[in-house]
């Protein structure tokens, strides 16, 4: 039984055979946090909770001889004596703060939350148990459920909060986290991922200190600046070893992840909706569900944490078995696309062995630059006088797929759609609209807007025989107001926008179940666990230089398996940073993910074309074998990155490493692989034989290099 309850002590042990999460119901009143870590096979003994009698603490009462000022509460607020970061702030009809809600019981079931408006986080084949702790406010008749869904076979817990209002007056919710985790020490290093456009997912490691450390987004999306994620690692944790608590949010909008160290060197981690841009009017007989936080514990270092998040991603996402290699038109043609040019590219792609042609930006009316028209999605009759169907048919004739770039959330004022429905955009009353990239944003909270987009996109896909859409979003939200919401509910719009996006993607997938959708927001600007259930792969950055992109992949791999990264071979010198790199490096790095080409095939030398053809054949042969393989970051100071990809049975592996600047000193330094089966014997492509123990500890010999930015892919298999 994954939930054990001791009524004498009030202890609830939520567990599988890997982790335990222990809550105590203190004095039949408040749930407090007692433990999160390795599984307890027997119910542990915990020292009695201290009363917390100290300066500035609330006076204890006979019913509750404790002070909430320092209690490790499961879910708390301000105004009742707890002065730390609140998990929730709710006001009643008198504009007064609700207190810390009191325990009324718990329930257990074998179903996930999987709210219809939020991303589904548990597949129907994944066994889970959900513990629900029920809290209530007797005055307002508000019921609050703290949800804990534990996976049977993973050290993973999903946490969320559900509000159910049984009272008679409106409540105003101004902060509502998905999870709060109170820990008894401050001896942690916080890992976060930060960045910007074309420089995403840079790991930051910072020791906790007194006060607040926060990452957040105010942009309307999760954004490239910060990931909705924070990990707390014990001292001396490495990629290979050490204790880590990882916490991410399955949400694609504004978020807040904060850790606070109080005056007693206790830590509180909260993650959830960003409170400055969130309000919700909770009406009588209504409910509200937060996004889910994804919580894990491991004692096998950052790689161990990543394995849990990767496995979570795989069960979350649509199937990847049908994802084709692609030729994308963007860096070849930009906006200057035409029927004849695309026809030639389809033929070249077929000759090289690529499996799909993607027609990027510029295919629709009045779109010859960034200031062109958005919103109507009509094929440009000048560039494509015969429409897109002949191109789709040409691709399908070669057993290739055909796809388009779209930016459905955006609109320009010169579009027919805007002329007909100016009230469909996000806007403030009596204010001049603020454009970014010459664009306004559609109000996805409106049902009419969503219905229009579903009809438009479904017709676009079906009428043009499309197999794929690259769904882009190239600006963030401003003037987040709606003509269709009353003044008292305008604070709900950031949240309603994201739920509207999920609704559109859900309905589009239902209407076009075989459609491949690539997630993009000027690269990795909306890459989160909220988008994964709706999309097959992600364009992680607009920076295509293999050296910088490898570091971006390395950062994102803390959370996501690189198999879902869309990686394209582009020209050298690189269009974004001017770096010159060997073709082999660009090819090999692109193979660690969903492989594509984004240059004119005529620019490739015959030898490069031959390399690409051979790589595509090998890529397809190994794809099914490695589609859910384990990915590890290998510790190295001698390479830009070093990675190991190992099948579940550890009988096959791929080692990939990327060198930086070349050195005149040609000293060989083997690379330890750490994660192979020590009892197996392996061979590489050249026939060299090694034991797994040898490769794990001594390392694999690496070839000296005579050029900058070289790389190598080494395939290993059991003898």
UniProtKB/Swiss-Prot annotation:
Keyword Translocase: no
Enzyme class per UniProt: hydrolase
Alphabetical list of PROSITE patterns matching this protein: ALPHA_GALACTOSIDASE
Keywords, in A-Z order: Glycosidase, Hydrolase
Keyword Lyase: no
Molecular function terms from GO: alpha-galactosidase activity
The enzyme's E.C. designation: 3.2.1.22
Active site: 472 (nucleophile), 542 (proton donor)
Disulfide bonds: none
Highest taxon in the source lineage: Bacteria
GO terms of biological process kind: carbohydrate catabolic process
Record InterPro entries: Aldolase_TIM, Alpga-gal_N_sf, Alpha-glycosidase_related, Glyco_hydro_27/36_CS, Glyco_hydro_36, Glyco_hydro_36_C, Glyco_hydro_36_N, Glyco_hydro_b
Catalytic activity entry: Hydrolysis of terminal, non-reducing alpha-D-galactose residues in alpha-D-galactosides, including galactose oligosaccharides, galactomannans and galactolipids
Similarity remark: Belongs to the glycosyl hydrolase 36 family.
Annotated function: Alpha-galactosidase associated with the sucrase operon.
Protein name: Alpha-galactosidase 2
Source species of the chain: Pediococcus pentosaceus
Primary gene name: agaS
């Amino acid at each position: 039984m994954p939930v054990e309850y001791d009524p004498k002590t009030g202890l609830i042990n939520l567990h599988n055979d890997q982790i335990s999460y222990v809550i105590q119901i203190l004095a039949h009143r408040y749930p407090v946090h007692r433990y999160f870590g390795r599984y307890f096979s027997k119910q542990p003994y915990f020292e009695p909770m201290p009363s917390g009698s100290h300066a500035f603490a609330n006076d204890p009462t006979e019913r509750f001889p404790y002070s909430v000022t320092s209690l490790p509460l499961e879910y708390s607020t301000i105004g009742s004596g707890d002065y730390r970061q609140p998990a929730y702030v709710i006001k009643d009809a008198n504009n007064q703060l609700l207190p810390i809600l009191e325990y009324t019981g718990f329930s257990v079931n074998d179903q996930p939350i999987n709210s219809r408006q939020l991303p589904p986080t548990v597949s129907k084949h994944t066994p889970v148990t959900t513990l629900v702790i029920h809290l209530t406010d007797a005055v307002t008749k508000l019921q609050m459920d703290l949800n804990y869904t534990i996976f049977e076979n993973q050290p993973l817990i999903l946490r969320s909060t559900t509000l159910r209002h049984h009272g008679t007056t409106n409540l105003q919710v101004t902060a509502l986290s998905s999870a709060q985790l109170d820990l008894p020490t401050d001896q942690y290093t916080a890992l976060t991922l930060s960045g910007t456009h074309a420089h995403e997912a840079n790991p930051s490691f910072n020791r906790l200190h007194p006060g607040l450390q926060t990452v957040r987004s105010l942009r309307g999306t999760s954004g490239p600046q910060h990931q909705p994620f924070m990990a707390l690692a014990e001292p001396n944790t490495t990629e290979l070893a050490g204790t880590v608590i990882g916490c991410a949010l399955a949400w694609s909008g504004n978020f807040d992840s904060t850790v606070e160290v109080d005056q007693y060197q206790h830590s509180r981690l909260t993650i959830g909706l960003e409170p400055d841009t969130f309000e919700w009017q909770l009406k009588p007989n209504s409910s509200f569900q937060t996004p889910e936080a994804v919580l894990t514990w491991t004692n096998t270092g950052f790689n161990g944490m990543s394995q849990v998040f990767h496995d979570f991603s795989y069960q979350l996402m649509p199937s990847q078995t049908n994802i084709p290699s692609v030729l994308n038109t963007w860096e070849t043609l930009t906006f200057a696309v035409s029927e004849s040019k695309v026809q030639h590219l389809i033929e070249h792609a077929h000759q090289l062995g690529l499996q799909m042609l993607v027609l990027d930006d510029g295919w629709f009316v009045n779109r010859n630059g960034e200031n062109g028209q958005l919103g109507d999605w009509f094929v440009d009759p000048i560039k494509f006088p015969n429409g897109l169907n002949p191109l789709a048919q040409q691709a399908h004739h070669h057993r290739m797929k055909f796809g388009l770039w779209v930016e459905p959330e955006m609109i320009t004022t010169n579009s027919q759609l805007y002329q007909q429905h100016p009230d469909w955009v996000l806007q403030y009353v009596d204010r001049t609209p603020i454009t970014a990239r010459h664009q306004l944003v559609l109000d996805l909270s409106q049902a009419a807007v969503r219905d229009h987009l579903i009809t438009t996109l479904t017709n676009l896909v079906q009428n043009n025989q499309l197999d794929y859409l690259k769904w882009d979003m190239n600006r963030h939200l401003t003037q987040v107001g709606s003509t269709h919401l009353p003044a008292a509910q305008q604070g709900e719009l950031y949240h309603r926008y994201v739920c509207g996006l999920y609704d559109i993607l859900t309905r589009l997938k239902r209407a076009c179940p075989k459609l491949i959708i690539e997630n993009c927001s000027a690269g990795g600007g909306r890459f989160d666990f909220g988008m994964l259930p709706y999309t097959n792969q992600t364009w992680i950055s607009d920076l295509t230089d293999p050296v910088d992109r490898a570091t971006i992949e390395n950062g994102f791999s803390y959370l996501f398996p690189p198999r879902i990264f869309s990686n394209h071979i582009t020209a050298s010198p690189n269009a974004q940073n001017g770096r010159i790199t060997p073709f082999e490096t660009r090819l090999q790095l692109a193979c660690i993910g969903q492989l594509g080409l984004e240059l004119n095939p005529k620019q490739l030398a015959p030898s490069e074309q031959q390399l690409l053809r051979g790589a595509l054949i090998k890529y397809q042969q190994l794809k099914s074998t490695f589609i859910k393989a384990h990915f590890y970051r290998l510790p190295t100071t001698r390479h830009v990155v070093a990675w190991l990809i190992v099948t579940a049975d550890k009988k096959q592996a791929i080692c990939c490493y990327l060198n930086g600047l070349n050195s005149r000193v040609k000293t060989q330094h083997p690379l330890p692989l750490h994660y192979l089966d020590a009892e197996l014997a392996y061979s590489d492509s050249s026939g060299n034989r090694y034991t797994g123990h040898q490769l794990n500890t001594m390392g694999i010999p690496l070839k000296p290099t005579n050029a900058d930015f070289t790389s190598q892919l080494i395939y290993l298999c059991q003898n």
